[in-house]
């Protein structure tokens, strides 16, 4: 096996002007830096939409995508956002990710871009190939109309179409922009090492769509949860709270959902 080296740098840590690192020019500059330094790998953290504590290891879906990584300058060049809207997103604290501001403003801007986006055959073909992202989009639309409550408390079944449309646009745009960065890196001899969460959140599209694949009771509460025993990092151990998989149930359909989860499948990573 050939010895090689790489750098772990999540997309959010790339330099940029819009509150968070993105798939913009800084991503290509980082690839150039890796090539110049003789590196062979770029490793990232999961691309999942992070939870309220900004952790990509706890998300609304294994197949979700972080909208903050979308390059806004590319959307401007495509005529999907205005110059005024672009400049309105310039960061106010340049050396950190502006999480609170992103929560308040980014999806609203992407919703405008989604409304202006005309779609097309390539757009629809994407969802034929990546149908698993549709469940996530429907889930987010359901949460929106139910006041962001966990899915087992939903009373409204009618989805918010504008939210569904926005998340479809986010997924398509994310993949399209990421593919350009990945292809650029591969062309420079840089392979991408990906990552995904080991478990999923209880309130997630994964559990909502496939509750039988998890160890839950009739009220959708986990009967067993994930964690780790005491170790040198935590004398009391850790209780993560994620529902455990029901492997016997998954075996009935050949573990189909798990076969979609590897980052090489979800996001097209090299490893």
Regions found by a protein language model. Give the residues of each.
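Conserved, well-ordered alpha-helix/loop/beta-strand core segments that scaffold catalytic motifs
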Residues: 167, 171-201
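Catalytic domains of carbohydrate-active enzymes, especially glycoside hydrolases
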Residues: 25-50, 264-269
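Mature N-terminal, pre-catalytic/accessory segment of carbohydrate-active enzymes
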Residues: 1-38
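Alpha-amylase-like alpha-glycosidases and glucanotransferases acting on alpha-linked glucans and related
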Residues: 8-10, 16-19, 54-175, 200-271
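Hydrophobic faces of well-ordered beta-strands that scaffold small-molecule active sites
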Residues: 5-9, 42-43, 192-194, 271
């Amino acid at each position: 096996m050939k010895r090689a080296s790489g750098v772990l740098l999540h997309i959010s840590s790339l330099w940029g002007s819009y509150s968070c690192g993105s798939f913009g020019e800084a991503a290509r500059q980082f690839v150039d830096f890796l090539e110049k330094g003789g590196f062979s790998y770029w490793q990232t953290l999961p691309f999942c939409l992070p939870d309220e504590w900004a952790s990509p290891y706890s998300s609304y879906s294994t197949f979700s995508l972080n909208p903050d990584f979308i390059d806004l300058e590319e959307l401007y060049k495509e005529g999907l956002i205005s110059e005024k809207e672009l400049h309105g997103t310039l960061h106010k604290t340049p050396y950190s990710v502006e999480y609170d501001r992103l929560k308040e403003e980014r999806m609203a801007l992407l919703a405008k871009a989604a409304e202006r986006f005309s779609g097309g055959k390539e757009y629809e073909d994407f969802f034929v190939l990546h149908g698993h992202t549709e469940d996530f989009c429907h889930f987010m639309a359901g949460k929106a109309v139910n006041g962001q409550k966990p899915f087992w408390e939903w009373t409204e079944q009618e989805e918010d179409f504008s939210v569904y449309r926005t998340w479809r646009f986010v997924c398509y745009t994310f993949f399209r922009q990421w593919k350009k960065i990945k292809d650029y890196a591969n062309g420079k001899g840089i392979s991408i090492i990906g990552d995904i969460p080991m478990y999923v959140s209880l309130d997630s599209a994964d559990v909502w769509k496939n509750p039988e694949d998890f160890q839950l009771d009739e009220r959708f509460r986990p009967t067993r949860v994930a964690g780790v025993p005491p170790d040198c990092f935590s004398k009391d151990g850790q209780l993560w709270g994620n529902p455990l998989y029901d492997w016997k149930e998954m075996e009935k359909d050949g573990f189909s959902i798990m076969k979609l989860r590897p980052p090489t499948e979800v996001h097209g990573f090299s490893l």
